[in-house]
């Protein structure tokens, strides 16, 4: 939800709260106590010698688009100016930059000649004064700005366009969305300076005809909290007065017409989004706010067709969508120059629903941002009445009596209780109850009780204040953070201890680095294909709705694909002998990715490629292989005192089918190890590479609770070798399992030292030789004891794997 920029007119603010401070001082005070001020801008800065001109005559220059104008700029004689604007004509008041004037980009106006005609200045558009195209009224977007008729020739133009106003740019965090309105900012400034607010009231005169005779409203979704409407008849749609256009442009909003501009004014003033419909374009007189149906669509005011889902909210008439609730109106019912009857809408929609819709459609608006963060329940209907009164005033409309409404909102203050001791302990202050009373009086909050226990009545306009800690924050802000004493904490220190998860991560990291692996950190976001490429059990993908690129669009469900990207990056830079590891998170999603957050699981992974030993005068070069990868894991498991099984698998499509094994711990798959499939390696542009990945949570759950110290025995061990003839398909793991199943307690080590297949061995068979070590920690072993052990082991091998002892 991030921060939202609110552009505050200093002139307008002073009308709402009586302050006598400079804009710079106000900005500093606000930043220190409540809301960060990004900056202050004066649109007139850098502009000079811009005056009102009255076009006395305007003649077309033959065979050109130019016009030769005589302009009264308050001098003794008219000023001749050549102008190319299509909307220049005699009788209008315009902006004139006289010779020596400075306009946007510090451009200086000089006397000149155009097509041989002398031009003593320039008739300006708003763009030439530095205003953005996005906020300039469309009727002036391709031409010059026309000033109000009452503008006096020769006067500086700044006061007529409010370019001399100071625009304070506030950065509003989600918890202070109450300041996304002029009334909210006024309350805040009044609290800071101990002033009172003064909000002008409108005199609403209603006709005898009731709104309920013209319109009916209903709610058919739990995500619509309330919906209310008024009807204004006999409206005259025209441009808004200049003061209203100036106010909107200074707030970053383009003026449209008096009806639409009134709704935007109310948005800025109350923080309450509104919409105006053309009543005569309705096919029915009943408005229903409901969830959209799959397959429905709506052409919004920007001319774009929007395909809707059941997660969207729509305003419907005759069961057809006419607006995307809380985001943007529909083109079919928009206000135009011929509109006569206007339906005004106010509502409160669920912020989460609006956020999903605007995010899915990448359609952010002033309305959607306010619904996402919250609106003041107490002024919803007041805003509706205020807008109707403004239309009565600016559009000569007749307001039907009353309003129609579906759904009710709580408007009474929210009560929060605490004590003076609670406040002082947390702030380190010695405030009195009188101090608390003064602060909450400045905030406009009600207060009852005494220092032992008091209750604060928080107005609905401050929906961010709901618990005692919020009250402490409000007290600290108004009291002054700079006045809070510096105190040391009184609580005694607590000895720190690693959690089991932290301890395991630290141990695994130490073991990995001791084995020669280098830690990397790869991106958690990858492509949808790579996200599941090496996942043993892929789940639903969690994807970004609007990714910067497809390369970083989905949360990973395995670590290996990211490691291979790192391997490829290094190999491309001539670094081919690599041993890398990473401890990070993968993201499994068993539910709906659009509704629920994924599960975050800690995994360990490594990748090795190239040589483990370089060729020198004594040794040959030695390349990595499956057994190097497995050896890393064996060392890891031995240090963790865990016993695992390796089971060959062909189920991982991106791994070599003959050199890959699943890793089982207590019969549960916790990871895999093996060679990356040659085809996959080619796709990544990497050499033969071996990888492994483990579930750290599974390792942690299986760790023995106690590590028992075993005394080093002083009695010697005895070793016996055994050579076995077996079927070629019998694995080393199966042999080890068979040997261990014999139950020989004195067996301490099993080592494979030879594997042979050749002409002396019959087809389909192989020879494997093992060295078995026996040791009694309390006594010397005898040959007879070891012989009995070997007999039991031989029997187990014969029965379980069909081994023939050679």
Curated annotation (Swiss-Prot):
- What are the UniProt keywords, alphabetically? Aminoacyl-tRNA synthetase, ATP-binding, Cytoplasm, Ligase, Magnesium, Metal-binding, Nucleotide-binding, Protein biosynthesis, RNA-binding, tRNA-binding
Q: InterPro entries in the record, alphabetically?
A: aa-tRNA-synth_II/BPL/LPL, B3/B4_tRNA-bd, DNA-bd_dom_put_sf, Fdx_antiC-bd, Fdx_antiC-bd_sf, NA-bd_OB-fold, Phe-tRNA-ligase_IIc_bsu, Phe-tRNA-ligase_IIc_bsu_bact
According to UniProt, the reaction catalysed is: tRNA(Phe) + L-phenylalanine + ATP = L-phenylalanyl-tRNA(Phe) + AMP + diphosphate + H(+)
CDD domains referenced in this protein's UniProt entry, alphabetically: PheRS_beta_core, tRNA_bind_bactPheRS
Cellular-component GO terms for this entry: phenylalanine-tRNA ligase complex
**Where would I find the B5 domain in this sequence?**
411-486
Molecular function, one GO term: ATP binding
Q: Where does Mg(2+) bind?
A: 464, 470, 473-474
User: What SMART domains does the annotation carry?
Assistant: B3_4, B5, FDX-ACB
Q: SUPFAM superfamilies given for it?
A: Anticodon-binding domain of PheRS, Class II aaRS and biotin synthetases, Nucleic acid-binding proteins, PheT/TilS domain, Putative DNA-binding domain
Q: Where is the tRNA-binding domain?
A: 44-158
Co-factor(s): Mg(2+)
Which biological processes are named by the entry's GO terms? phenylalanyl-tRNA aminoacylation
Q: How is the cofactor bound?
A: Binds 2 magnesium ions per tetramer.
EC class (word):
ligase
The protein here is known as Phenylalanine--tRNA ligase beta subunit
State the organism named in the record: Streptococcus pyogenes serotype M28 (strain MGAS6180)
Q: What is the lineage of its organism?
A: Bacteria, Bacillati, Bacillota, Bacilli, Lactobacillales
